[in-house]
């Protein structure tokens, strides 16, 4: 689908250039990569892009957005907002969304997404079932949490309700306390609420792994990053990047592309290329198709990347 271009943030650019002033050795690399990326003469491999410092990655992407109006149509970032009436019918609150996920989608598939750990009706994880005994002393590792594959902060942080919740009367409690940005957006922004509670974007995860992944982007880390027992998840806090297990990459890719198309969220060209690759390499299996059908029956909208899977260019 066509997508409306989102302009670069002046604040983000100023922060990026201020960072480079403090780290002068990045200037040459940043200038070269950004310039070549702008003209489109060279597309950096996404695995190499993942290894760049986050400030440099963001600066390159923001530079592309700034010159986007000057580029040929085929190179542009374009987004089209989804009308409110076209949004999926998702749960009205977070508690209901989680309960629906566990009781109506995963009721007979009680294993976590990334690490394949078994869990019981009380959402207590059997760490021995997936080789995560090394986390036995971590209380958060013993519970299941609903993980946003497309991080909520990524589609919330540019919204006014997230940035300035104090401006909304509905975001103040009876005692005068101002709600957090996430809580405020859930109250006043229907599109955010729908995306936040969309079951297509929610997966049961070991709580500790969910917390360590935080809101990091997906990508490749080669051998750089923390690992957890027998789980193939790898996370690098300095790069703010997480490399998922091979078995989860196809589902992650199709989820990210679904969220992009359904809610108009922006993905960088590097991210899109990565997700196309993962989608092509890892087609949906029987459970992913069944999961999609169950969610479609609940929300009225399925994930077309699962339902009508095909190789992406």
Predicted features along the sequence, with ranges:
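Nuclease and nuclease-like effector domains acting on nucleic acids or nucleotide cofactors
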Residues: 2-143, 155-173, 198, 219-241, ...
